[in-house]
Amino acid sequence: MEATLSMKISGRNKFKGKVINIVPGIVTAEVEIDMGNGNIVAGVITKRSLEDLQIKQGDELTALIKATSVMFIKE
C-alpha cells in the first residue's frame, strides 16, 4: 500500500530535477540533480536516506534549499 502525504514546508527554494550522479560513501552520499538549462545542484544526504528513498540515477527529485541545508524529496 502506498501512502500519500500532504505537507507544508518552510523551505521556499524548491527546485525539481533529475538525478544525474550519486557518489555513495560509507555514511553519506552526494546526489547531483540536473534542473535543466545547465543548472545542477548537489547535496549530501545520509546513506540511510538514500536507501530509504530508493534514490537512483534518472529519478525525479525536488531539492529544498535553505541557508544551512539542502534536502531532497522523491514524489
Annotate each predicted stretch with a short phrase.
Residues M1-E75:
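Non-catalytic connector elements of ABC transporters
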